[in-house]
């Protein structure tokens, strides 16, 4: 298999043109461009697919999509210096016939894989390492018709920086039960952070769809006001998600996810509340993966974590924690009656997105994309509706519980 020499590519009026290699200027949040490090790129042909690994000097945002006529897979990065990149590393995959790399637009770099057959990304993950980060992609063959249906440039994928303003005015919070319950639904990931991916299903897409359906269920029921942290394929930093909840004086913050495990056979829904120490090692790693999204987006969370820590110290949590516990209990009770939950349905971990001290906050893993059964559930409209109704009933039950608690503790 012959590969062309590594080259830069640019787009003008929709037409790709080939340029000679040149250095790229640093852009956006990174001190320097990510370098292709060590072994650079490796591809292992498995016969029924291929595994691609790209070693970088630091983690960067990325997105993947496919194109037809001819068959191509495109991987955008923010941002990579391709100096020294050797495309010969791809000569072990029959599905890949050529590779081109270069600048895409200011702040972004692109890799284009020419394909000999239709393939899909079965799993995608960028893992931090001591040397930087490695992007792992698992490719598998798919039918021509499926490839065509999934292909196309993602027009709505955007990236919001941490400093972008949230145009929401302050709203006064009222006692629980004295008015509509104001619920902030947080569909995890989005934009350049797709979350977990399995069999062509992206966590960001599935959670957005579920959040929109859950919003509709709550609004139709009456007694709820619902705000989504994102309503399209947009990347929203963790701090911004928290800011949205506080800006609208949320009564409840519910973050929705569907993670994937590299090992084990875990399945079923799991509910997480905030704790400094995770329930177990798996919960700790899960929190690290979720929080890594902002790192991948080039956002420095160190100062923000200090701010959040100060808020946690300054604000009384003696009221919020019991309310969160009662909310978690209500959710587990209703969900267990309606859908299958994990053998440990409620756990704790240090998710940054739950660190709003004055808003009861829950992270709900609706299932594991690494579980075929859970994947089937997440794409099943009937299952999603059943889960949404259970959450609606749990929120209603929690309102009654809080009203009773308020009456009993009234001076």
What is each residue range found by the language model?
Residues 56-58, 77-79, 115-117, 137-141, ...:
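Flexible glycine-/small-residue-rich
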Residues 63-65, 84, 192-196, 281, ...:
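Short, solvent-exposed loop/turn elements at domain surfaces
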């Amino acid at each position: 298999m012959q590969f062309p020499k590594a080259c830069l590519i640019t787009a003008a009026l929709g037409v790709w043109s080939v340029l000679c290699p040149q250095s790229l200027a640093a852009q956006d949040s990174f001190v320097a461009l990510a370098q292709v490090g060590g072994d650079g790129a490796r591809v292992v042909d498995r016969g029924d697919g291929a595994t691609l690994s790209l070693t970088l000097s630091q983690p960067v945002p990325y997105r993947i999509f496919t194109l037809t006529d001819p068959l191509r897979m495109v991987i955008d990065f923010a941002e990579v210096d391709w100096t020294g990149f050797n495309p010969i590393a791809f000569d072990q995959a029959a599905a890949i016939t050529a590779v081109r790399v270069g600048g895409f637009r200011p702040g972004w770099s692109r890799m284009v894989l020419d394909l000999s057959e239709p393939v899909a990304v079965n799993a995608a993950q960028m893992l931090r390492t001591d040397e930087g980060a490695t992007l792992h992609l698992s490719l598998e063959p798919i039918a021509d018709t499926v490839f065509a249906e999934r292909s196309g440039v993602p027009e709505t994928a955007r990236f919001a920086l941490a400093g972008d303003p949230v145009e929401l005015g302050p709203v006064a919070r009222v006692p629980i039960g004295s008015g509509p319950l104001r619920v902030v639904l947080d569909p995890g990931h989005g934009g350049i952070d797709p979350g977990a991916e399995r069999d062509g299903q992206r966590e960001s897409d599935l959670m957005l769809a579920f959040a929109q359906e859950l919003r509709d269920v709550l609004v139709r029921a009456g007694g709820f006001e619902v705000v989504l942290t994102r309503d399209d394929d947009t990347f929203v930093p963790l701090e911004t998600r928290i800011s949205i909840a506080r800006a609208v004086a949320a009564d409840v913050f519910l973050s929705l996810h569907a993670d994937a495990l590299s090992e084990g056979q875990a399945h079923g829904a799991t509910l997480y509340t905030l704790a400094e120490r995770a329930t177990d090692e798996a919960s700790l790693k899960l929190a690290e993966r979720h929080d890594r999204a902002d790192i991948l987006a080039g956002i420095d969370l160190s100062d923000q974590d200090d701010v959040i820590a100060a808020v946690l110290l300054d604000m009384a949590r003696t009221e919020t924690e019991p309310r969160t516990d009662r909310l978690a209990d209500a959710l587990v009770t209703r969900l267990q009656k309606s859908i299958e939950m994990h053998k440990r349905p409620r756990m704790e971990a240090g998710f940054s997105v739950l660190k709003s001290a004055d808003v009861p906050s829950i992270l709900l893993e609706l299932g594991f994309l690494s579980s075929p059964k859970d994947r089937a559930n997440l794409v099943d409209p009937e299952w999603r509706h059943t889960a949404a109704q259970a959450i609606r009933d749990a929120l209603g039950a929690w309102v009654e519980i809080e009203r009773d608690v308020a009456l009993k503790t009234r001076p």
